[in-house]
Amino acid sequence: MSFVHQKCRNIDTVYLGSNIHRLNVPDNLVKWSQEWSGYNPPAHTDPKVDGAVWADPEIDEKTFQPSWNAIDGKINRVSYVCQYSFDPVTLRPLNPIGRTGLSGRGLLGRWGPNHAADPIVSRTNDNGDLEFVAVQRHDNGEWAIPGGMVDAGEHVSQTLRREFAEEAMHGIVDSENLDELWNNGKELYRGYVDDPRNTDNAWMETVVFNFHDSKGLLKNVALQAGDDAKALRWIAVNSNEPLYASHSHFIDLLKESHSH
C-alpha cells in the first residue's frame, strides 16, 4: 500500500485531550517492514476509555479473548484494509498503514479497527453548484461530514441514517419523507481513515455513502446541528474548505462521482 498517513503523525500539537506529543516518525520509517530497532513511542490510552462499557479492556486482561480479524460476537474486528498483524512482544494489533509515533489506544475504544460510517448528504443548489451537509466538531472546531461510530451489533446502513439524524436533524431518525433519500445511497469509500486519534494499535476505518437529494426532499426538513456538533451548514464542493481527517478526500470522491 503506497498511502502514507499524515494527520495521525502530527507532532506540532499534543494528542487530543492530553498533554502527550507523538514521537516523530519520518516518512521512510512509517512502514513496519522498515527496521527501526530503537522505536519506542509514548503510550497513551485516555482515562475515558479505561473501563468504559463501549471499549475493550487492556489486552493482557485474562478474561479478554477476542477473535481478531473476525466478527467477534457483535463486534466487527475485521479490517477493510487487510488481515492485520500483531506486535510479537505486546500482542497488540498493528496499524496496517504503519507507525504513528504513539502506542496504546488513545481515544479509541477498540484495539485494532474502530469502525465508523460517514453519510454525505448532497444537493445541487439553485446556481448549479454541488453542495454537501457539514457539521462543525466540538473537539477541534473543524468542519466535517456528519458521521460516527458503528455501535456493536449495528448494521452500517443503520449507522449512516442514525448518525445523520443525531448530528444534523436533532435526533429525528424516522422522517418518512426521507426514506427515498436513504434507500438510494451510493458507496464512495470503504477503508482506512487518516484520523488524528489513530495510534499504532488502534485506528479508524469507515464506509462513506453519498445520499444525493435530486428531488428536493430536504427542502421541508429543518436541518440543525445536534448535541454532538457546534454548527451546521451546506458547503460547496469547490470551496476548498479545510475538513477534518480524511474528509477532504471523501469530498473529492463525491465530486468525481457527480462529474460523469
UniProtKB/Swiss-Prot annotation:
A motif (Nudix box) lies at residues 148-170. Mg(2+) binds at E163, E167. GO terms for molecular function: ADP-ribose diphosphatase activity; metal ion binding. Residues 113-257 form the Nudix hydrolase domain. Pfam families: NUDIX. Keywords: Hydrolase, Magnesium, Manganese, Metal-binding. It is an enzyme of class 3 (hydrolase). PROSITE patterns: NUDIX (PS51462). Probably mediates the hydrolysis of some nucleoside diphosphate derivatives. This is Putative nudix hydrolase 6.
